[in-house]
Amino acid sequence: MYASALASNKKYTFICLLPEHLEGEYWTAVETGIHEAIATYSDFNTSVKINYYDPYDYHSFENASEAILALQPDGVMVAPTAPQYTKGFTDQLQALDIPYIYIDSNIKDVPPLAFFGQNSRQSGYFAARMMMLLARDEKEIVIFRKIHEGIVGSNQQENREIGFRQYMKEHHPSCTILELDLHAERNDEDNENAG
């Protein structure tokens, strides 16, 4: 298989759509892994371009998606944002017969070719279990939720909360869950407002 791939003259172009991030944040490691894969598989006549969207601006995701569609790559790796914005993009990819995979967050209603990441619902369930090992007798707890344009920050965040609430309902039904919605701002704006 390796020899036939090397013998092929076809060039493949892949595009990754990731949220903009600061050096050292979670997405830095993801991007490093992408660059390592590019170097490792450079013999396969592939090129990979990374496009970014502003995670605090859903319209930025739409604009970045449109730019990718115009290039008509051979495949796309996308870190999904809110499902309603991701679905528009993936519907167009399907119409163009461009395969796509998700990284970090899975949207089951819009199934990809593959998904690489954790089960967000199980993660939330586990987080509640760990928290209640320390807060066992508490009568109230607070969930802090990132909200942007009236929408819970991400599909992943929403699924974590579902798992969290499921654990609490099953194991601590008398504990009241309070919500505090934090209206999302960029990290640099949060730092300016804190000072």
Regions found by a protein language model. Name each.
Residues Y2-E31, L113-A114, E140-V152:
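Short beta-strand segments enriched in small/hydrophobic residues
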Residues H35-I50, K169-C175:
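Signal peptide-proximal N-terminal region
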Residues I68, G75-A95, F164, L182-G195:
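Hydrophobic alpha-helical
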Residues Q84-Q122, K146:
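Flexible loop/hinge segments that line or gate small-molecule binding clefts
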Residues F115-I141, E192-G195:
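Hydrophobic alpha-helical segments within soluble ligand-binding/sensing domains
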